Amino acid sequence: MDKRISIAIDGPAAAGKSTVAKVVAKKLSYVYIDTGAMYRTITYAALEQKVDIENEEKLMEVVKNVNIEFQQGENTQLVFLNGQDVSEVIRTPDVTNRVSIVAKHRLVREEMVRRQQGLAKKGGVVMDGRDIGTHVLPDAEVKIFMLASVEERAERRHLENMNKGFDSNLEQLREEIARRDKLDSEREVSPLKKADDALELDTTSLSIEEVVQKIMGIVSGVFAK
């Protein structure tokens, strides 16, 4: 497996992309790039500075002054904002409920895509997000589009919130996930969309291990060519 390829994993909110992408990256000894964490970091920075996230011009002032770095922790990936560890605070419901608004802005996405492509230049990456296969890494050798029902995704996020000690309401989560799906799918710039050459994977009734196994099978097929 000397060949180092790029793997793009796309899908809607709470489809399990990050969890699966991390495991796949670890198995391959690849770099994992969580593009969602980048948008979350921008969102967190804007909220901290009390910037109107609907105002693209003001948001870009935040973006220009934000340096985002990833470091591998013991069991997880750490995210740093200008040297500060923000790995936990960017996962709070406040950030989660606003990140799709930040991500809809054209100039913000263009800058994030530029940074993401820079990180992926040498290959050997697993990147997950909403527009990786269609826009960020259109030439990725493996493209996966992960799906799961709103109900399943709400239950996963509810469990995740409870485990982190966040207040969580299942019905509210269903509504928020459906709203994020709508925002992500209907935005003008790089909407959530399956790439024509992506393989669709419905994870509703699959465990993380089963999803990882399927993706590793696809990757092995590419290495065998």
Swiss-Prot record:
The record, for InterPro entries, names: Cytidylate_kin, Cytidylate_kinase_dom, P-loop_NTPase
Q: Does the keyword Protein transport apply?
A: no
Q: Name one GO molecular function term.
A: dCMP kinase activity
The biological process GO terms on file are: nucleobase-containing small molecule interconversion; pyrimidine nucleotide metabolic process
Quote the record's binding site residues for ATP. Answer: G11, P12, A13, A14, A15, G16, K17, S18, T19
State the compartments where it is located. Cytoplasm
Bilayer-spanning residue ranges: none
Provide the alphabetized UniProt keywords. Answer: ATP-binding, Cytoplasm, Kinase, Nucleotide-binding, Transferase
Which protein are we looking at? Answer: Cytidylate kinase
NCBIfam families the record matches = cmk
Q: Which Gene3D superfamilies match?
A: P-loop containing nucleotide triphosphate hydrolases
Q: Provide GO CC annotations from the record.
A: cytosol
Where is it chiefly localized?
cytoplasm
Q: Which reaction does it catalyse?
A: CMP + ATP = CDP + ADP; dCMP + ATP = dCDP + ADP
**Listed EC numbers:** 2.7.4.25
- Highest taxon, organism lineage: Bacteria
Q: Which family does it belong to?
A: Belongs to the cytidylate kinase family. Type 1 subfamily.
